[in-house]
Regions:
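Signature of exported/secreted
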Residues: 21-330
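Bacterial Sec-dependent N-terminal signal peptides
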Residues: 1-26
Length: 330
């Protein structure tokens, strides 16, 4: 049970037009100034580290190149971006198989992003028809799980996969990956202030949310007339994690372990949880080009820490996006 609890904490830890400029009143505003047909290319890398006691090892890694193309531009309504994966490498065979299956049937398009005139994200959508092949995707991932875990009964994964691979969750995964790149668009920030905020992180298993609190600010020393460097940090403590974690674990157990003693599982979980120490911390550092509003560099890091019965563990996830230099100027 300790392994299940630690694993889930890590999973849960995994959703007006004009040129932006430095203002004369010591503020900075991030605004999209995109034109129809504009296209930027980004190199991305994501690495997940597992921590057990004092040991840290690479659990999985992904990398590739994506493009973001403006396919609709309206000064009053906003913009639509098409996000496409041009190259992709996955160390996880299941993720690789899923990506290959989606690319085979739907091409390179990952999702579409609709924004307001400032570049503030309004909604995400996935390629038409992707949600209709849910059962095919579930079967493909189930087959990959059979190969990776030959000693396990593959049917135990099916309820979990049916919860995970849905049109809503495919949109949520795209939202979690790409929305932070544009989270500061539309904001006008003073150079000398830190802004406090609260964020309610939704669950994909229940209707619950997890509250995280933190602050963001402009790094004045690294900001000039060409670009702005923005930073954010947010955390969730044990009391904020408790209802979120417990409700989600119960949902997973009820779906994946129907033949097991539910009362005993719940009792064991409560005992472990009462003594557990846990925390989640997110950090974001982003550089945005002021003249166009395109992100130049982006770093996301999530630290998950867990101590159960003196056994320490956790996970670090680090994701970066870097604009390909020769494509910065349109």
């Amino acid at each position: 049970m300790k392994k299940i609890l630690l694993l889930f904490v890590c999973l849960a830890a995994n959703l007006l037009p004009g040129r932006a400029q430095m203002m004369p009143d010591s503020t900075v505003q991030v605004v999209a100034y995109w034109k129809l047909g504009d296209k930027q290319y980004y190199r991305y890398e994501s690495t997940q580290f597992k921590i057990k006691q004092q040991d840290t090892v690479v659990a999985k890694r992904s990398a590739g190149i994506i493009s973001m193309e403006v396919i609709s531009a309206d000064e009053e309504k906003g913009y639509r971006l098409k996000v496409s994966t041009l190259e992709s490498q996955e160390s996880d065979p299941i993720a690789e198989a899923l990506n290959e299956q989606i690319a085979k049937n739907f091409g390179a398009e990952d999702c579409y992003i609709d924004t307001d005139p400032y570049g503030t994200i309004q909604q995400f959508s996935i390629p038409e028809g992707l949600g209709e092949c849910q059962e095919d995707l579930i079967k493909m991932v189930s087959d990959a799980l059979k190969q990776k875990y030959p000693d396990e009964n593959p049917d135990i994964f099916l309820p979990f996969l049916r919860q995970m691979i849905t049109p809503e969750n495919l949109v949520a995964m795209a939202t979690n990956l790409y929305s932070p790149l544009f989270m500061f668009h539309g904001a006008r920030l003073a150079l000398s202030e830190k802004y406090e905020f609260e964020d309610n992180v939704p669950s994909i298993f229940t209707d619950g949310t997890m509250k995280m609190s933190g602050y963001f600010w402009v790094n004045e020393e690294a900001t000039d007339e060409e670009s702005v460097l923005l930073q954010l940090t947010k955390t969730a403590d044990k009391e904020e994690l408790k209802p979120f974690l417990f409700n989600n674990l119960n949902a997973i157990i009820q779906n994946m372990a129907k033949d097991m003693d539910q009362e005993t599982l719940t009792s064991d979980l409560e005992k472990l949880y009462d003594t557990a120490k846990m925390s989640i911390t997110d950090q974001i550092v982003e550089v945005v080009h002021l003249d166009t509003g395109w992100p130049i560099e982006y770093l996301f890091r999530r630290d998950v820490e867990m101590v159960i019965s003196d056994e320490a563990g956790g996970q670090i996830t680090q994701t970066t996006f870097s604009i390909i230099p020769q494509e910065v100027e349109q």
